[in-house]
Amino acid sequence: MAEEQAQPQLALERIYVKDMSLEVPGAGVFTKEWNPELDINLSSNAEKLDDDHYQVVLTVSVTAKNAEEAAFIAEVHQAGIFLLKDIPEDQIGQILGAYCPNVLFPYAREVISDIVTRGSFPQLLLAPVNFDQAYAQSQQQVDAEGNA
């Protein structure tokens, strides 16, 4: 009797805010008309916890300047524990680099919006991000550097 092929399993087992902060360097920003310039940075990293579990942390940083003055710096490290069991090795990078950040982003977006409004600034809703495209571009860059 032939052994059954194990079915791949992919699941989010836990989601949590690993770290978050809001810095408002000066109160003078509240006395000026609000017309901010935003600088948004995203990054993610993955850490293998055991044979089947990975922690993926999506970091979202937003720096707002208003009239050339720093208004706020908001940052969240949104984390998730993911089960990846019997996943083909060639698919793990794509899952950790694109799928998991796609899952985490709406939660990080909500935290950023919440802490910014709690700082008495207007609501900030970050636009959706195509992590699949970003991952593909990063892989192309790695491949190009490897061939150089």
Curated annotation (Swiss-Prot):
InterPro entries from the UniProt entry: SecB, SecB-like_sf
Subcellular location: Cytoplasm
Pfam families hit by this protein: SecB
Main location group: cytoplasm
Annotated keywords: Chaperone, Cytoplasm, Protein transport, Translocation, Transport
GO BP annotations listed: protein folding; protein tetramerization; protein transport
Cleaved signal peptide residues: none
GO CC terms: cytoplasm
Top-level taxon in the UniProt lineage: Bacteria
Gene Ontology MF: a single term: unfolded protein binding
Role description: One of the proteins required for the normal export of preproteins out of the cell cytoplasm. It is a molecular chaperone that binds to a subset of precursor proteins, maintaining them in a translocation-competent state. It also specifically binds to its receptor SecA.
Subunit structure: Homotetramer, a dimer of dimers. One homotetramer interacts with 1 SecA dimer.
Family named by the database record: Belongs to the SecB family.
Protein name (database record): Protein-export protein SecB
Origin species: Psychrobacter arcticus (strain DSM 17307 / VKM B-2377 / 273-4)
Lineage: Bacteria, Pseudomonadati, Pseudomonadota, Gammaproteobacteria, Moraxellales
